[in-house]
Amino acid sequence: MDLGAGTLSLEIERALRPLDSLCGFARRRNPRRAFLIVSRVLGRHIPVRPSEMRVAARDLAAALPSDLPGPVLTVGLAETAVCLGQTVHEERARLRGGESHFLHSTRQEIDAPLLCRFEEPHSHASAHLIYRPEGLDLARVRTLLLVDDEISTGTTLANLGAAIARHLPGLERIAAASLTDWSGGGAWLDSMPRPASASSLIEGRLEWRPAKATEAAPATGFAAVAGRLGRIERHWNSGRLGSQAGAPIALPAYSPPAGQRRLRVVGTGEFTYPPFLLAERLEREGHDVVVQATSRSPVLPGGAVGAALRFSDNYGTDVPNFLYNAEAADGRHTIVCHETPPGSVDPALVEALGAEALFFGGPGCAP
């Protein structure tokens, strides 16, 4: 397929779902990788019903090996796979039982002991932080499960596996899970420090051939800004410091305005799993709900990406943030969910969608 900046060729070798039901494709402003695989079941760039997100995570959890020794530590990659990782973690624990813990990488600094840092080579914001999980003896972990939305070369997960494994002296196996895996046979698994396997809903190969003349890449200044880490002074632990399967997560006592049945729940950056749970609750109550989330990733309109909103980062960095495929004209009432202090969400986003901002750190929510 021609994406303007180049041609993307795909070869599907195994599929548990049709390609079009899982993802589309777009072009992004990133000199490191000019194309974007846009998931239709992730709840990030494309609006999706929370029930569909849950089913995709359940299918991915079921595709994992059934004999992973526990305790299992699942790690979701920020920002895109935080919600997916935590949902797969919960679904795998529900399906297989046993002791299971979750942790996600972050680009936010908090006042907590750092476990490790690693790099995501093709990202516009390459640095990831992993904090030491609370209440977990790392020496007991026997399986490390790494979750990302897609695998292209496997380099990111190989870097992550190597960074974490040195802190897990009892580690026996590493497993990777992704919605789509384009690594073409998984040779990257051989570089893992323990025996490793990969599971996905679609497996195949891709080849990117850049065009000779492409639109100008972002300025060097943008790349420097995009790599900045944020800082959270008052931290809501929804996964940065770990959580155990089945642990309750308190949600705001929220009710939509009277007469509003069509809703859009928007997570912000890495803060996506609690908003997803809120969306599930609203869907169970009979509302027509879709989930989306803001992103640092600059994407050009076209392909699977239509409308684009640009606004400031609610985490206080100078990194531009975006929300795609969301328009006030669709008639949905928008709830922008955030863990950052009240007033931190850019009014430009709120006004563009006629939205309300919902803080998840107030009374009735666990800090």
Question: Where are the predicted features?
Answer:
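PRPP-associated nucleotide enzymes
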Residues: 1-367
